[in-house]
Regions:
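A compositional/biophysical signature of low hydrophobicity enriched in polar/charged and small residues
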Residues: 1-158
């Protein structure tokens, strides 16, 4: 989908505040509410906008630690990769999982309450997934940057 300067401005406004009113978005991008609404609906239909979420503080809900886990599998068969991905999808604490190139097969981001909670998750969930050869974990000490898509570097369609 080709996005013009108005589409990109709408996306930026929604990234900044997905709860902004159509009037506020229109004022920010230089359009009235109806054209904004039509553009938003088109971007939703075409999959540019995948949904709207709330940015919830993990700490406010007791998830005090984030763990980054690197996993190497025994096999790289389609069946093994599929089964590992399916098993990860069933673990609620897994926030993100990436199949990657390099020394490891997967990088996983996990939210846990504390080290005991992580140890429990390892024993009861992660290490019960068949096919894991090796894993390496690191606790995040501090998050240095969390950001959204860099819309400022996207060139608008003419």
């Amino acid at each position: 989908m080709r996005l013009d300067k108005f589409d990109l401005a709408i996306l930026k406004a929604l990234q900044d505040d997905a709860r902004a009113s159509l009037n506020d978005i229109g004022a920010a991008v230089g359009l009235s509410a109806t054209p904004c609404w039509n553009r938003i609906k088109r971007m939703e239909r075409e999959g540019v906008i995948r949904g709207y979420t709330a940015d919830i503080s993990p700490e406010a809900l007791g998830f005090m630690d984030t763990v980054i886990v690197h996993v190497t599998l025994e096999s790289h068969s389609d069946a093994t990769l599929y089964e590992f991905g399916r098993a990860l999808a069933e673990i609620p604490e897994v926030l993100e999982a990436f199949l990657v190139s390099g020394d490891y097969d997967y990088i996983i981001r996990i939210a846990v309450r504390d080290t005991r909670d992580y140890e429990r998750l390892l024993r009861e969930r992660l290490y019960r997934i068949p096919g894991i050869r090796h894993s390496k974990s690191g606790f995040v000490l501090r998050s240095l940057k969390q950001s959204r898509l860099p819309l400022s570097v996207v060139a608008p369609a003419a």
